[in-house]
Amino acid sequence: MSKKKTIAFLAGGTARAAGITAHVLRKKAEKTTYKAELIEPVQPRKMGFYEKYVKRGLDVACASAAIICFSPLYIGVALLVKFKLGSPVIFTQDRPGLVDKDGRETVFKMYKFRTMTDERDENGELLPDDVRLTKFGAWLRKTSLDELAETFNILNGTMSVIGPRPQLVRDMTFMTKEQRMRHTAKPGLSGLAQVNGRNAITWDQKYIKKVGFKEDVRIILETVKKAFIKQEGISQDDMATAEDFGDYLLRTGKISQEEYQDKQRIAKQILTESGK
């Protein structure tokens, strides 16, 4: 067999293996994905050709290539987390994903490498995030290495390489319908907001109006430049644990204490009814 044929054979085999793996992971993810039924629906956005037919294939290709090429890095981070923080190595959390046909967000399990301890108070309640976040965990977040595990979310179809960053379920309940339009695009590992230096919803609203191949490539290149060349993270600057959207609205006087408590109650109910 010639060298060219060997390369073509290996490339074809790798592509088939990636496709099968993505299919299996997607079926598994469907069993843990549920819908946020307690919030009002938004109007689903019409997707273009690229977003509807091309983007998913590129996501699988990019995620598979990243896992294969950077497998030593994945293993190294996993071993460090195991040594520094113990088990589990992977942290999962429910996050709002793509809006379904009925206008309500699906909620999926997002994967991250663990950055915090499980320290609890005398009542068995977890201590605040800023207390449980270790120096090692803060470094993982600063370098965005904790985000590497999200490539498996990309493979299972709950996330994309590029798209609005997935917020917390409780953040979603505080958003207006216009702000929730960000969820009409699949959540991403990086997005327009991150390469512009801040996690602002307005950037996500701009992104959904111009989803396209050229824009995604530009954001990927900007992300590589920011995360690897400039060695900056893709999270909000100077915030190891970002402020919840509801806390921000309450702090700035944009909502009342009563509204705040009501939205928090809805968020807890969404998570509780999921069987969590």
What are the roles of these predicted feature ranges?
Residues 1-11:
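Membrane-penetrating hydrophobic segments
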Residues 187, 191-199:
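Short, intrinsically disordered, charge-balanced linker/junction segments flanking boundaries
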Residues 127-187, 220-223:
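A short, structured surface patch at a secondary-structure boundary
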Residues 63, 91, 134-138, 170, ...:
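Positions in alpha-helical segments
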Residues 119-127:
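A short, polar/charged loop-to-alpha-helix boundary motif
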Residues 12, 17-32, 42-118, 213, ...:
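A hydrophobic, helix-centered structural microdomain
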Residues 117-120, 158:
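Feature marks short, surface-exposed loop/turn motifs that line or immediately flank catalytic pockets
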Residues 204-209:
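Acyl-group handling in specialized metabolite and lipid biosynthesis
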